[in-house]
Amino acid sequence: MTRYQHLATLLAERIEQGLYRHGEKLPSVRSLSREHGVSISTVQQAYQTLETMKLITPQPRSGYFVAQRKAQPPVPPMTRPVQRPVEITQWDQVLDMLVAHSDSSIVPLSKSTPDVETPSLKPLWRELSRVVQHNLQTVLGYDLLAGQRVLREQIARLMLDSGSVVTADDIIITSGCHNSMSLALMAVCKPGDIVAVESPCYYGSMQMLRGMGVKVIEIPTDPETGISVEALELALEQWPIKGIILVPNCNNPLGFIMPDARKRAVLSLAQRHDIVIFEDDVYGELATEYPRPRTIHSWDIDGRVLLCSSFSKSIAPGLRVGWGAPGRYHDKLMHMKYAISSFNVPSTQMAAATFVLEGHYHRHIRRMRQNYQRNLALYTCWIREYFPCEICITRPKGGFLLWIELPEQVDMVCVARQLCRMKIQVAAGSIFSASGKYRNCLRINCALPLSETYREALKQIGEAVYRAME
């Protein structure tokens, strides 16, 4: 991000937060130049960017003023899915989207990919090079089945921040959170079982369940506080549910952080009905609050919570470093790993361990939390400007994803196909439902560095939505 883009993002965030109100005069070009230690031309470019976004308006000989803005869109209401076990219907649509990711000319707003070009990752790339040069025998040999111990020790220390007390022996390294969740599900479930999920739910989890022949029951979910405990309890009383998949911290796709009281209530239900909880904490480190939120796993006393996480969202997906803390299912998960995915790559594990050990990871996370928070604020500004007034939009408490609910008549599955022909890809809401619900919704990735390309893409998405409403 250039200096003027950084300044424009900062000012846009202040406007979004109400620090500069409608009609209020903004600081002069010279005063901003002095305050931020940048050139006058940098400030002028930043103001021009905000003017293009219609966040500010110039007045001759008077300076810049905050422009009149559309009203803040409401947060989507509690979801109301079909509350009975169903077979997952979303398959081809998800595969088509994943295949399209290989086209480098597409603006990838559908992928949940972090910013991997940030300077805070440079120590990791240097360490990767050093590991390969100086540990050739280890790098080219077989890994330990549980993964490199030095990495498991560092992960155990990281998990203390979320309230979980584990040792290196409790942790199994996997090839990402997706792999960890897949192994956890296979260790517990068999074809014909029923698993409860939040609604909407990350499509990757449902693809695993479909591949295993497992049915799903979607539970109503509040976009600000998470799954409905009452609805979950009712489902547990009615159906032989084997377990529940939850993303309680910086949820994908809704962005909420489940309050601690609700996390404990869900765990209490799991204990009472003797089911397992598959907890996905891959976004937990990216929470805007500090200290980071606790996991449900941190209150688990009988090993029924299988925690799955990775560095795919906090560092980079290409590392392929994930982990599981599967509690009472540890040995079974080890057997499943050996049978299905076997060993991991030692080099990326060793580099990641050093990255954490030397303090680079925490510095990187602090930077990314700030960057993603700014991005979410600016993307929200763009969406408010270019989309219809009738939308609802989430207010994520971390991570880098936005969920947008459009008017009922908008079919985002059809709109997404049109956008794909325009080289813009979004994730239509229907892939986040077992039964194809949420066709009038979409998820947007806000992690990528801010640029005119993404602003123009959001403008074109808004125009396509307007056309769909005609």
Residue locations for each model-derived region?
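Conserved core of the PLP fold type I
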Residues: 133-273, 278, 284-299, 372, ...
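Short, conserved active-site loop motifs that form the nucleotide-linked donor/cofactor pocket
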Residues: 275, 305, 391, 424
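AMP-binding (ANL) adenylation modules
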Residues: 432-436
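Amphipathic, non-transmembrane alpha-helical secondary structure
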Residues: 8, 12, 182, 186, ...
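N-terminal basic, amphipathic alpha-helical segments
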Residues: 1-130, 334, 338-345, 366, ...
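PLP-dependent aminotransferase class I/II
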Residues: 305-385, 392-394
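Short beta-strand "wing" residues that participate in macromolecule-binding interfaces
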Residues: 57-58, 166, 426
